[in-house]
Swiss-Prot record:
Belongs to the DEAD box helicase family. eIF4A subfamily. The gene is tif1. A motif (DEAD box) lies at residues 168-171. ATP binds at residues 63-70. GO terms for biological process: cytoplasmic translational initiation. Pfam families: DEAD, Helicase_C. It is found in: Cytoplasm. GO terms for cellular component: cytoplasmic stress granule; cytosol; eukaryotic translation initiation factor 4F complex. This is ATP-dependent RNA helicase eIF4A. It comes from Schizosaccharomyces pombe (strain 972 / ATCC 24843). Residues 50-220 form the Helicase ATP-binding domain.
Length: 392
């Protein structure tokens, strides 16, 4: 029975979608902050969750990292804050110091034009510094349950003005043993505080929190095929001519130790050619493209997943279907012919919270396409540094 609950998926009970940030009636300075941060249009979770949160409903969202969830609650928090009131109006909990600091950065960046004070309360820092910052007055506190609980107990963090309580990665927090502190914090908040809970999975202890502390929540399930470039280091190598790519690839392999890599080419012919070239040079390579039947593909994927082949060469056709945990490196031997496929190729390297590296081979003819990709995703692809080995 427990196992069934472990993986239970919530059912969405809300399907209103707002397609653009402009239609969300946000404060002009917040909207400017969103665009300045590089967001162009809301991701699936942002389209669905921001409005109900702004409507002061309790919201339960099942979403993986990389779906844009941090900005979802950050935008909502910033919209609701009264900056003329120097009191903590929103409290955000996260399982780790790193995540708490990351959330703080997003809140500060999006609220750049709003004069918002956002403080990170995390372990490993001086308690007296926390107390001083909180006493100076902040609008938003983001932190780990232990330190936040401590600050409330010491009366350094008054909770009477808290209108919104956000629990990010609730499954992680509860599995790390923060249950008692979280329950205590709930008891110390005003009964009217709105609760927003985000979790990738819905195990029993998360469902318990939702039934105990949430009032008739709006439930939103975001499928995890929304990809992101967050956490992925993107580089390019300038290779003047197509003919030089093979040597560049071999040189790269001499400098880095890679557990596994996926290499994308634009044509099946090139996949076959490159496979042949690398096999001749004693690399263990598998290749996959659309001419193969499903059984062949499954065998190859199995080989790659189990690590018996370390390099998988493939075309865009399969960009969406490769979901391999250990892939730390994606190489675009050819830049994709259309921009949309770029994220499907490299957005997987950093899944499951793993960081990834992508390296793009760029000929003189590809420079324009690379700039287009950068613009389209509002991202930056840097020239590959000499110490690339340390980054993979």
């Amino acid at each position: 029975m427990v196992d069934q609950l472990e993986d239970s998926v919530i059912e969405t009970n809300y399907d209103e979608v707002i397609d653009t940030f402009d239609d969300m009636n946000l404060k002009p300075e917040l909207l400017r902050g969103i665009y300045a941060y590089g967001f162009e249009r809301p991701s699936a979770i942002q389209q669905r969750a921001i409005m109900p949160i702004l409507g002061e409903r309790d919201v339960l969202a099942q979403a993986q990292s990389g779906t844009g969830k941090t900005a979802t609650f950050s935008i909502s928090v910033l919209q609701k804050i009264d900056t003329s009131l120097k009191q903590c109006q929103a409290l955000i909990l996260a399982p780790t110091r790193e995540l708490a600091q990351q959330i703080q950065k997003v809140v500060v960046a999006l609220g750049d034009l709003m004069n918002v004070e956002c403080h990170a309360c995390i372990g490993g820092t001086l308690v007296r510094d926390d107390m001083a910052a909180l006493q100076a007055g902040v609008h938003v506190v983001v932190g780990t349950p232990g330190r936040v609980h401590d600050m409330i107990q010491r009366r350094a963090l008054p909770t009477d003005a808290v209108q919104m309580f956000v629990l990010d990665e609730a499954d992680e927090m509860l599995s790390r043993g923060f249950k008692d502190q979280i329950y205590d914090i709930f008891q110390l908040l005003p009964p009217t505080a709105q609760v927003v809970l985000l979790s990738a999975t819905m195990p029993q202890d998360v469902l318990e929190v939702t039934t105990k502390f949430m009032r008739d929540p709006i439930r939103i399930l975001v499928k995890k095929d929304e990809l992101t470039l967050e956490g992925i280091k993107q580089f390019y190598v300038a290779v003047e001519k197509e003919e030089w790519k093979l040597d560049t690839l071999c040189d790269l392999y001499e400098t880095v130790t890679v557990t596994q890599a996926v290499i994308f080419c634009n044509t099946r012919r090139k996949v076959d050619w490159l496979t042949e070239q690398l096999t001749e040079r004693d690399f263990t390579v598998s290749s996959m493209h659309g001419d193969m039947d499903q059984a062949q593909r499954d065998t190859l994927m199995h080989e790659f997943r189990t690590g018996s082949s370390r390099i998988l060469i493939t075309t865009d056709l399969l960009a969406r279907g490769i979901d391999v945990q250990q892939v730390s490196l994606v190489i675009n031997y050819d830049l994709p012919a259309n921009r949309e496929n770029y994220i499907h190729r490299i957005g997987r390297g950093g899944r499951f919270g793993r960081k990834g590296v992508s390296i793009n081979f760029v000929t003189n003819d590809d420079v324009r396409m690379m700039r287009e990709i950068e613009q389209f995703y509002n991202t930056h692809i840097e020239e590959m540094p000499m110490n690339i080995a340390d980054l993979i």
